[in-house]
Regions:
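Hydrophobic transmembrane alpha-helices and immediately adjacent juxtamembrane helices
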Residues: 1-292
């Protein structure tokens, strides 16, 4: 933690900034993070540069990735498996779920290796370590904005062709839902990042785990499909990503299963994951250079 000090000592003995170790379990200086907002912006720009450096299509992959995935979902789950889509066009159904899920998955995957991939930088200069994962989720937020714009273009096409889709009042909740998804991704990501300093296997397992998590979420199937399997439906509802996905579909397609229990549970889980993640991150950052 850094703090500004005003002293009357001679210039050769004066310090403008003193770095002291953190002592509390939840010792996060929000004012300090705000003072380093320019650094966060620089990290966001760097993330884009590193991600698409030496690629032929560059940032076009932001659009191509979810678009290709949606087409595959539509062919495999909609065509071959003939899964229901609650009466809305399958392409939009899968794109809606995939857009929300991709945002969450990017937040988790991009923050999961914060300590390991930035150990050299952390060992050379001081700055709030939490700026790194924050910059990663902000990068994911920008990607989501671009993908959401693409989704709206396809939505407009299907709306114009009389597909029966419509926006509902739930659309007003979308900014808050996406904020929740971002905070959940940040919380889970920094938990994994903190644990990978000692258990490197997690860095490999997190990608696989996120993929499995997707199939436990109503991305390729509607929650209503599980009405005849009450126990399985309850298990899926215990997934904190179920409520955000269903709300997004309800908001933009007019179909979905939104419950008070699902909303409250998802919010509580997100808050718990974020608090636990920040506490763990704060404790690990003191000693991670000895284990990385």
């Amino acid at each position: 933690m850094a703090e500004n000090l005003q002293t009357t000592r001679p210039a050769e003995e004066s310090w403008t900034t003193v770095i002291r170790p953190k002592t509390g379990w939840f010792d996060i200086d929000l004012n300090e993070l705000w003072r380093y907002r320019d650094l966060i912006t620089m990290f966001v720009k760097r993330n884009f540069t590193v991600l698409y450096k030496q690629t032929i299509l560059g940032p076009a992959w932001i659009i191509l990735n979810p678009l290709i995935t949606t087409i595959i979902f539509n062919v495999v789950f909609g065509g071959m498996a003939n899964m229901p889509t609650d009466g809305v066009p399958g392409f939009l159904f899968y794109m809606a779920g995939n857009t929300v899920w991709t945002f969450f998955a990017n937040c988790v995957n991009n923050t999961a290796n914060t300590f390991v991939t930035n150990s050299q930088v952390f060992g050379k200069v001081y700055f709030p370590r939490l700026t790194m994962p924050i910059s990663q989720v902000l990068t994911s937020l920008i990607n989501f904005g671009i993908q959401a714009a693409m989704y709206l273009i396809f939505w407009g096409y299907f709306f114009a062709t009389g597909s029966g889709i419509t926006f509902t009042l739930w659309a007003l909740a979308i900014p808050f839902v996406m904020l929740e998804v971002m905070l959940l991704g940040l919380g889970v990501g920094i938990i994994v990042s903190s644990l990978t300093t000692k258990y490197r296997d997690l860095a490999i397992a997190v990608g696989f785990g996120v993929q499995l998590w997707m199939y436990a979420s109503p991305v390729v199937y509607p929650l209503s499909m599980l009405d005849n399997s009450p126990r399985l439906k309850v298990l899926v509802q215990l997934n904190p990503m179920t409520s955000p996905i269903e709300i997004f579909r309800m908001a933009t397609l007019g179909t979905g299963t939104v419950t008070v229990f699902g909303i409250v549970y998802s919010l509580i889980f997100t808050a718990a994951a974020l608090v636990f993640g920040v506490v763990l991150f704060s404790r690990i950052e003191k000693t991670f250079m000895d284990t990385v």
